[in-house]
Amino acid sequence: MNAPAAFESFLLLDDKKIYIEKDTKVPNAAIFTINKEDHTLGNMLKIQLLKDPEVLFAGYKNPHPLEHKILLRVQTTNATTPADALTTAITDLVGELSLLEHRIDSAIKKCTQSTDTERGYN
């Protein structure tokens, strides 16, 4: 079979997680190659980047279904760099995901408490 071994989808081995390449076709742009990631992270980063008013363009692609990497292209205004915009987007995503985790934990706790009360455990 032509498919790579399953472990190749998540083990970095001696490879770097991210490579940055300046995009010479457009001003103030870069292409980030993020290894061992897929559409989940690519779409989250793209959406978060597009919320930033300093980001003019953000898009990603997976070059091939059997390659476990994404190419994220970012173009910004002169007020910031693509790397800074990506760092800000990642920081904002971590905050949003932490808030989501907290809300889920609270909802589970509330549901468990109400179920325990209904069953007479409290």
From Swiss-Prot:
Entry GO terms, CC: RNA polymerase II, core complex
Entries under Gene3D superfamilies matching the protein: RNA polymerase, RBP11-like subunit
UniProt keyword annotations, A-Z: DNA-directed RNA polymerase, Nucleus, Transcription
Pfam families: RNA_pol_L_2
Keyword Transmembrane: no
Recorded coiled-coil stretches: none
Compartments in which it is found: Nucleus
GO biological-process terms attached to the record: transcription by RNA polymerase II
Transmembrane listed as a keyword: no
Predominant location category: nucleus
Classification via PROSITE patterns: RNA_POL_L_13KD (PS01154)
CDD domains with a match to the protein in the record: RNAP_II_RPB11 (cd06926)
Superkingdom field: Eukaryota
GO molecular function: DNA binding; DNA-directed RNA polymerase activity; protein dimerization activity
Residues annotated as signal peptide: none
Entry similarity comment: Belongs to the archaeal Rpo11/eukaryotic RPB11/RPC19 RNA polymerase subunit family.
Role, per record: DNA-dependent RNA polymerase catalyzes the transcription of DNA into RNA using the four ribonucleoside triphosphates as substrates. Component of RNA polymerase II which synthesizes mRNA precursors and many functional non-coding RNAs. Pol II is the central component of the basal RNA polymerase II transcription machinery. It is composed of mobile elements that move relative to each other. RPB11 is part of the core element with the central large cleft.
Complex and partners: Component of the RNA polymerase II (Pol II) complex consisting of 12 subunits.
Protein's recorded name: Probable DNA-directed RNA polymerase II subunit RPB11
Organism: Caenorhabditis briggsae
Highest classification ranks of the organism: Eukaryota, Metazoa, Ecdysozoa, Nematoda, Chromadorea
Primary gene name: rpb-11
